[in-house]
Each structure stands twice: as C-alpha cells, then as structure tokens.
Amino acid sequence: SILQKYHPTPDFQQAFKHEKSGNFVMKYASGQALVTLPFFIVGHMWASNSTIYPADGFSFPYHFSVGVGLFLLSLLGMFYLRKVLLVYFKDRTVAALLIIYVIGTNYINYAAVDQAMTHNTLFTIYALLLWMTIRFYIAYESRYAIAIGILTGLATLIRPTEIISILIPIFWGINSISGLKTRIDVIKKQFSKFVLAGIFFGLVAMIQPIYWKIVANEWLGYSYGD
C-alpha cells in the first residue's frame, strides 16, 4: 500500500471514517489541495510518461513538481508584497523591509522546505489580496472585484478562519468616521462590484460543502470527527 511503500505519515490521522456513510473524510479543508492541483497534474504527467516512477501520486515527480510549484508561489507572494509596499514607501525602505521579513521569519523554511504547508500559500494570497484591493479602489473595475472574491474564497477554503480576510477589502484605507461614511457611499455606488466579489467568494468557498456532500452526504461537517 501507499502507507507501507512511502511512509508519508507515522499515523494515518489525516482522515476519519464517517459513521453514517462509511466513507473516509479528509480532516483538512480542501483549499491547499486546490492550489497544488496544477503542480500535481504536472507531476502526474511526468510520472505517467516515465518508466522509472509510478504514477501513484506519491513518487518523486509529484514531490518535485509540488515543491517547485509552491516555491515559485512563495516568490510570487514576495513580488506582490513588494508592489504593495512600494505604494507607501521608497524602494530602499521596501528592500530593507523585505530582507528583514525573509531573514526574520519562517518564510525561507516554508518556501524551500515545508512548501506543502499552508503558511506561504496564505502569505501569497494575502499579498495578492492587498494589491487587488488597492487597485480596486483606484479603478473600481470588475476584474479586481472578481479577483478579490476568488482570493478571499480561496483563503477561506484553505483555512476556514481566514474568512476574516473579507474585512480587508471592505475596510481598507478607513482611518476615520468620515472615511467610513465615504466607504458606505462607495459601496452604494459600486454595489454591483461588491455583489460580484461576493458571488465569486461563494463559488470558491462552496467547494468544501460540496466535498462534504459527496463523501458524507452532509452539507456541513465537522471534519475532525472527534
């Protein structure tokens, strides 16, 4: 079996057996799997055309493709963080801040060693979300609203508590009561854009309830099963 061949975990606790359906249900939300899917597909194509590695989802091509893909995703997050910071600070200041961030946090570990963890994926999503929010309040274009909806939905799909990410585009730049009143006026005038963002948020976030419905015949589930 996969467990005996690759020993991916000392104790198979990533899923639990659902009592009513009899199916195994993954404990973790599906967002990270969705993010890694393109890289997994590359690994699968590699393994499927290889005479050395089995196309079983766990051989070297999968590890390599997912690892490199998520490493590049971490770099994308750094790229967009720089773009966000340059809106407010000079280039030298931004360079110093990025260096401090890289050497003073776990960024390198989650970029180059533990890429499959959600930390740097969420880092990149938040960097993109900040950038799309800034652009939205400059141009009020539908494409930015759609991006905001997808990014907040994906963050929630990765870690449900990240639903708080929706507060960023709603309250971004508000630092006074008058600013809050202005934002309310903006929401009224650009209501269709906010609805559009909400629709795409829902489309992405609904992936998790759909998964639960398919495997456990329940729209809402407590995935840890204890």
What are the residue ranges of the model-derived segments?
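Aromatic- and kink-enriched transmembrane "portal" helix at the membrane-lumen/periplasm boundary
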Residues: 54-77, 98-128, 132, 153, ...
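Membrane-interface alpha helices of multi-pass inner-membrane proteins
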Residues: 144-159, 166-170, 202-203
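Interfacial juxtamembrane loops and adjacent helix segments
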Residues: 1-68
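Transmembrane signal-anchor helices characteristic of membrane glycosylation enzymes that use polyprenol
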Residues: 1-2, 99-106, 156, 199-214
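Transmembrane-helix signature of polytopic, membrane-embedded enzymes
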Residues: 48-57, 76-105, 124, 138-148
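Membrane-interface catalytic loops of GT-C/OST-like multi-pass glycosylation enzymes that act
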Residues: 26, 110-120, 158-160, 213-226
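Membrane-interface transmembrane helices that cradle and orient dolichyl/undecaprenyl
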Residues: 129-145, 179
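Membrane-lumen/periplasm interface segments of specific transmembrane helices
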Residues: 168, 172-176, 189-226
